[in-house]
Amino acid sequence: MKKPFYITTPIYYPSGKLHIGSAYTTIACDVLARYKRLMGHEVFYLTGLDEHGQKIQTKAKEAGITPQTYVDNMAKDVKALWQLLDISYDTFIRTTDDYHEEVVAAVFEKLLAQDDIYLGEYSGWYSVSDEEFFTESQLKEVFRDEDGQVIGGIAPSGHEVEWVSEESYFLRLSKYDDRLVAFFKERPDFIQPDGRMNEMVKNFIEPGLEDLAVSRTTFTWGVPVPSDPKHVVYVWIDALLNYATALGYRQANHANFDKFWNGTVFHMVGKDILRFHSIYWPILLMMLDLPMPDRLIAHGWFVMKDGKMSKSKGNVVYPEMLVERFGLDPLRYYLMRSLPVGSDGTFTPEDYVGRINYELANDLGNLLNRTVAMINKYFDGTVPAYVDNGTAFDADLSQLIDAQLADYHKHMEAVDYPRALEAVWTIIARTNKYIDETAPWVLAKEDGDKAQLASVMAHLAASLRLVAHVIQPFMMETSAAIMAQLGLEPVSDLSTLALADFPANTKVVAKGTPIFPRLDMEAEIDYIKAQMGDSSAISQEKEWVPEEVALKSEKDVITFETFDAVEIRVAEVKEVSKVEGSEKLLRFRVDAGDGQDRQILSGIAKFYPNEQELVGKKLQIVANLKPRKMMKKYISQGMILSAEHGDQLTVLTVDSSVPNGSIIG
């Protein structure tokens, strides 16, 4: 029997509207929860809100309402957002919930009694927005008066700090630093991705852990300390304990805590709060003699070209706008595909619309449309029985799919969503290539091979069924739509993932509806920019007078005759590999209609880390470029055309129906 699986988001601080950064974390956890359920695990998925603190009290006062009313309103909005994003959480915890507050108070008194908490006095620079104290050396900027005395400053987050001096209770972190280091050595994979643990050790543990202030007396919106009610429990005991209280820790009904805390426990957080979860939380668990979580995943941020999202910059992206305009699945796909593990990702409207058009509409949508149409045309809508090796290309397709499915599961277990989706899109690309290889329109002719045609249709339908299964945790609506068009029930598990498992005598829909209609790139990019508040970047409609257009080009103007001397052809990628000794070059074997394949070297390796996704693509190449020697031993017999956009590069392709060697121009 598989172990129960517990996955948590951080609890969000409801001081403002949530943007796609918070949506990313919540969707990422949702994808993992759905995947684990499909793999047969019993899953508990927790999210919620951190509703106490000075900032909430201040904002409520400014709004003329009580703090409770303020957080009630925010909780309603956040729940509505998670419903819009189809988040399959099991519990939505609020730190104002009675059961949570009762456990927080009891734990505080327990730690006080065992001398892991003590009363002292704290003086330091405090950021209300960050709810954190900073030393002078930690401040990003220091303000001084005319005598050189420090009078204020800016926290690393960019928020202003103020000097605070007050009586406070402290958590004895320093008592546990050796145990924490020992734990890190025993569990080197506890913090992911690799490298984050060393960052915590070098920056915070090696300099010496300082005891942590865990109560405040300057505001009242929090859990009162029972034995000293002028103090309220400070955020990092209150907030972190939610992961245990939501399961029933120290409550009458603790069955879920017994089950899931002793199962597999994953926390996912943004890298900005890693310190609190990698240092404070494990030490708190040591004090309470509770088992450690299995994994702490700290992801990067989505940033804009001009830095972090900011309303003043007009670059904040809210998920509601993207869902209402483009649907839910494109947002879930984009966020999970575009943030590299361990790094930040850059959101651009161009990339968002481009991924919908090229990866969802072209690659996946066209494959489904063509498959359903051909099964209707050639077999009256009934999928032929699956047979192995009905054509010379079946074995290669099957082997690639098996290998990519293994990669998919490996990357899903590692919570490496971009690579998991790369594996899926490699299957999609190979299946599209399979259509071109087998040429079903030729097999369907009177003198064609109907048995081979049947095998092709069965393999296409079976491949799409597998794709619908593995994308289900990411894109539930799309998965269900593919299964419906194939005449199948929605995905309910991932246990039957073999081509041969396609049900016999299945009837596809009479006419498939495009699951991702192509978008007008310019119009939709302008729409996103307008919603972000970037009016300066929007195309303005005006009367078009061609003679008045100021033409722009990066190079000198050439004559038509000069351009006409360039021969651009369609070339299909047969093979592609990295070039040994070069980080930039890829080595292509292409069919450009010469009768024999050519070799082309192209410096695009960094833009295509999974170079195999290019196999089967029909590219545009300069065919009459004089061959040249590269890397001393390779001859390059042409140039692959590509387009640069920002810091990205995309090769230029043509429709798969265009024959190899066709002249462009």
From Swiss-Prot:
Matching CDD domains: Anticodon_Ia_Met, MetRS_core, tRNA_bind_EcMetRS_like
Molecular functions (GO terms): ATP binding; methionine-tRNA ligase activity; tRNA binding
Superkingdom of source: Bacteria
InterPro entries: Anticodon_Met, Met-tRNA-synth_bsu_C, Met-tRNA_synth, Met-tRNA_synth_2, Methionyl/Leucyl_tRNA_Synth, MetRS_core, NA-bd_OB-fold, Rossmann-like_a/b/a_fold
Listed SUPFAM superfamilies: Anticodon-binding domain of a subclass of class I aminoacyl-tRNA synthetases, Nucleic acid-binding proteins, Nucleotidylyl transferase
Pfam families according to UniProt: Anticodon_3, tRNA-synt_1g, tRNA_bind
Catalysed conversion reaction: tRNA(Met) + L-methionine + ATP = L-methionyl-tRNA(Met) + AMP + diphosphate
Swiss-Prot/TrEMBL GO biological process terms: methionyl-tRNA aminoacylation
Keyword Nucleotide-binding: yes
Principal location class: cytoplasm
tRNA-binding domain segment(s): 562-665
Gene Ontology terms: cellular component: cytoplasm
PROSITE patterns assigned to the protein according to its UniProt record, in alphabetical order: TRBD
Keyword entries, A-Z: Aminoacyl-tRNA synthetase, ATP-binding, Cytoplasm, Ligase, Nucleotide-binding, Protein biosynthesis, RNA-binding, tRNA-binding
Its EC number(s): 6.1.1.10
Residues reported to bind ATP: K311
Subcellular location: Cytoplasm
Keyword check for RNA-binding: yes
Motif range ('HIGH' region): 12-22
Family: Belongs to the class-I aminoacyl-tRNA synthetase family. MetG type 2B subfamily.
Known partners and oligomeric status: Homodimer.
Entry function: Is required not only for elongation of protein synthesis but also for the initiation of all mRNA translation through initiator tRNA(fMet) aminoacylation.
Protein name according to UniProt: Methionine--tRNA ligase
Organism: Streptococcus pyogenes serotype M1
